[in-house]
Amino acid sequence: MTSAEPRAYPFNDVHGLTLAGRYGELQETEPVSRVRPPYGEEAWLVTRYEDVRAVLGDGRFVRGPSMTRDEPRTRPEMVKGGLLSMDPPEHSRLRRLVVKAFTARRAESLRPRAREIAHELVDQMAATGQPADLVAMFARQLPVRVICELLGVPSADHDRFTRWSGAFLSTAEVTAEEMQEAAEQAYAYMGDLIDRRRKEPTDDLVSALVQARDQQDSLSEQELLDLAIGLLVAGYESTTTQIADFVYLLMTRPELRRQLLDRPELIPSAVEELTRWVPLGVGTAFPRYAVEDVTLRGVTIRAGEPVLASTGAANRDQAQFPDADRIDVDRTPNQHLGFGHGVHHCLGAPLARVELQVALEVLLQRLPGIRLGIPETQLRWSEGMLLRGPLELPVVW
């Protein structure tokens, strides 16, 4: 059964990282329900782990229609294009070529350099003095510099990429013209880098993408450009926000910080658990569209209707995760959906894991006494954005 009147959506408060209680209520009483977002069409909202995983992994739910539909969303502008808007077979073709180049081994090989970068950033924080803004000086710096290393961008140009990435960030206070200018400069730079790697390949990801082959198939020039910039943008905002959110939780939950200080070997599993526990989005983005009538929990989703599969709610489903609202860094198994599921499972998950593990490892090693430099009630949180996180995180140690 579903209620007659769609509920206003999203449910989460942007100030903080709590998961709205409405999700748990719906899991119990109406796991497939109608919602009305502030922009776009009404949609079906799916909240139980089993159902969310099924929707994300079922070929009867696709992303392609998002290119032409007024898709349900929490922000006025629509995010279109890229791998996330494609369906098989075109999506399969591109992903197959990218996976040949962007391997878990390649991500892991960046761990030593990621550590060096993290230590350099902490050095700069220490030199600046206390309080230091962890968001500006660490969380926004580490991901873009690691991605630059991955792509093969020379160190001398890292600051340029940091500026461009900052303009792409949904929390950035820039005009549409400034964002467009940053995009044009980033595309021009990456086009030049691709040309150089065609002539003189190295062991970086751009060279590997240029050389990627699947039988007689290869990436076109535009596909190379879109993928390289897409990796930068997709990998930047999410990991930046996760670093800030995870450190915020360590500072506001002393027992959690003490546990990781005493047992740093738990950091990899802590990253998995925090990825599960933190409902990163204000709401659920990137709807899937039914290509035929599908019945889920006794509810018929008609062909063409959009479905929002809430991974944030699924990751707190008590039926899948015992004591789901508790952060348990020893939790096993932990088959969370923080990086998605199915054909659109996050390509950058191995790199994100490396970055998040290194961030916690280095910060706890270098700044074991790290704590908030202002009262928690004075923190400013991003508003009107896709992802939830503090705009600044003043810290002392």
Swiss-Prot record:
InterPro entries (alphabetical): Cyt_P450, Cyt_P450_B, Cyt_P450_CS, Cyt_P450_sf
Q: What EC number(s) has UniProt assigned to this enzyme?
A: 1.14.-.-
The disruption phenotype is:
Cells lacking this gene do not produce mycinamicin I, mycinamicin II and mycinamicin V, and accumulate mycinamicin IV.
- The broad enzyme category this protein falls into is oxidoreductase
Positions of the region Disordered? 63-86
Please name the pathway.
Answer: Antibiotic biosynthesis; mycinamicin biosynthesis
Example GO BP:
antibiotic biosynthetic process
> A GO molecular-function term, please?
oxidoreductase activity, acting on paired donors, with incorporation or reduction of molecular oxygen
Name the residues that bind heme: 91, 95, 288, 344, 346
Cite the binding residues for substrate.
Answer: 81
* Pfam families reported in the protein's UniProt record: p450 (PF00067)
Q: Its domain of life?
A: Bacteria
The annotated regions of Basic and acidic residues compositional bias extend over 68-78
Which keywords does this Swiss-Prot/TrEMBL entry list? Answer: Antibiotic biosynthesis, Heme, Iron, Metal-binding, Monooxygenase, NADP, Oxidoreductase
| SUPFAM superfamilies in the record | Cytochrome P450
Q: Kindly list the cofactors needed.
A: heme
Instruction: State its role.
Output: Involved in the biosynthesis of mycinamicin, a 16-membered macrolide antibiotic. Catalyzes consecutive hydroxylation (at C14) and epoxidation (at C12-C13) reactions with mycinamicin IV as initial substrate, leading to mycinamicin II. These reactions require prior dimethylation of 6-deoxyallose to mycinose for effective conversion by the dual function MycG enzyme.
Report the sequence similarity comment from the record. Belongs to the cytochrome P450 family.
Q: What is this protein called?
A: Mycinamicin IV hydroxylase/epoxidase
